[in-house]
Curated annotation (Swiss-Prot):
Any Pfam family: Homeodomain
Highest taxon of the lineage: Eukaryota
Lineage, opening ranks: Eukaryota, Metazoa, Ecdysozoa, Nematoda, Chromadorea
Record field: compositional bias (Low complexity): 9-24, 49-67
Name of this chain's protein: Homeobox protein ceh-22
UniProt-annotated stretches for the region Disordered: 1-68, 135-190
Domain notes: The homeobox domain is required for the induction of distal tip cell fate.
Alphabetized SMART domains for the sequence: HOX
Organism field: Caenorhabditis elegans
Keyword DNA-binding: yes
Keywords: Developmental protein, DNA-binding, Homeobox, Nucleus
Biological processes annotated in GO: cell differentiation; cell fate specification; gonad morphogenesis; nematode pharyngeal muscle development; positive regulation of transcription by RNA polymerase II; regulation of transcription by RNA polymerase II
GO molecular function ontology, one term from the record: sequence-specific DNA binding
Length: 346
């Protein structure tokens, strides 16, 4: 006899499988199930007489049902998610798939695996990388602009190098100037000269006028006052003493040169250089009894150019006219060689 309880237990699994199967398969399944149920009801209605015949006809049907059930289970197994066929991923991980890149990286992210990254080893010195590593430029540039930029950068670099070289040359020149030859062929370094300010020089000169030699405590006090070292103050005083001593020794030499020069006011040099000539000099005569010898002896002309008895001076009567006719109370003709003389009354 056909087992109805086994059929009822099998129908829920078939119904669950039918929800996943396709519509055509569901239709075949329903027809087969309906046929089986109808056969079962018909066989139960016939009684025990038809039990043997129904069991013989149910064997092929069970085989077809089991084959259909195995087929549905195999298809259901293919739809179930497994670790090998399906991987659950989030939305950000699937974004690279839109651009044609694989979601899984092909290399390790461990920094210890690779060496240090040096951009200069892969790209040019002007900073322009490949298109696959950089974003497109918003302002496209031509090759000429790139060449100009590279030339300007090279020019700036060369200018900086030139400035550095010039500075180094100046430093070397200063060092060479600081070195001087002492005569033995060896270079001796000379210290650079220290320039004092006006205030420092004024204070040093003022102290030197009052005191030419300073003791060690006085040097230290003066150095602290004008912000110098005691050694600088000592050297300044030594140099200044030498300069003043040298200037004093030069002054007597100049005086000796002046004394050895010929005197321009001597009588002999004047007589030899200038011709003698008598010049009338106006003067006041108070006493009319003065003689010509006295006048000639006290004349400024004779004082300047020698004595009256000198052979260079001629006699007054040789070139002076007589003035006796012009002055009634004047002196004698011998003493009247002064034409512009005014006489006082006696």
């Amino acid at each position: 006899m056909f087992n109805v309880s086994a059929l009822r237990a099998a129908t829920p699994s078939i119904a669950s499988v039918s929800s996943v199967a396709s519509p055509s398969e569901q239709h075949g399944l329903s027809t087969s199930v309906g046929v089986g149920v109808n056969d079962t009801t018909s066989r139960t209605g016939d009684g025990g007489a038809a039990s043997s015949a129904s069991s013989a006809s149910a064997a092929p049907q069970q085989q077809s049902q089991s084959a259909l059930h195995n087929k549905l289970e195999a298809k259901w197994d293919t739809l179930l998610p497994t670790d090998t066929n399906l991987q659950c991923s989030t939305w950000p991980d699937s974004i690279p798939l839109l651009a044609g890149y694989s979601a899984t990286p092909t290399f390790s992210f461990d920094p210890c695996t690779y060496g240090s990254y040096d951009p200069s080893a892969y790209f040019a010195s002007n900073g322009i990388a490949g298109s696959m590593y950089t974003l497109p430029d918003q302002f496209p540039r031509s090759e000429n602009d790139m060449l100009d930029n590279s030339n300007t950068s090279n020019g700036n670099k060369s200018d900086k190098d030139g400035i550095k070289l010039e500075d180094e040359d100046e430093i070397l020149e200063d060092e060479e100037n600081d070195e001087e030859d002492d005569g033995t062929g060896k270079r001796k370094k000379r210290k650079r000269r220290v320039l004092f300010t006006k205030a420092q020089t004024y204070e040093l000169e003022r102290r030197f006028r009052s005191q030419k030699y300073l003791s060690a405590p006085e040097r230290e006090a003066l150095a602290m006052q004008i912000r110098l070292t005691p050694t600088q103050v000592k050297i300044w005083f030594q140099n200044h003493r030498y300069k003043t001593k040298k200037s004093h020794t030069d002054k007597p030499i100049n005086a000796a040169l002046l004394t050895t020069m010929p005197n321009a006011f001597s009588s002999q040099s004047t007589a030899a250089s200038f011709p003698t000539r008598a010049m009338p000099i106006p003067m006041l005569v108070r006493d009319s009894s003065a003689r010509s010898s006295d006048i000639s002896s006290t004349s400024p002309y004779t004082v300047a150019f020698g004595s009256a008895n000198s052979g260079y001076l001629p006699t007054p009567s040789a070139y002076l006219p007589a003035t006796s006719g012009y002055f009634s109370n004047g002196p004698s003709a011998a003493s009247s060689y002064m034409t512009n003389t005014q006489w006082w009354p006696s």
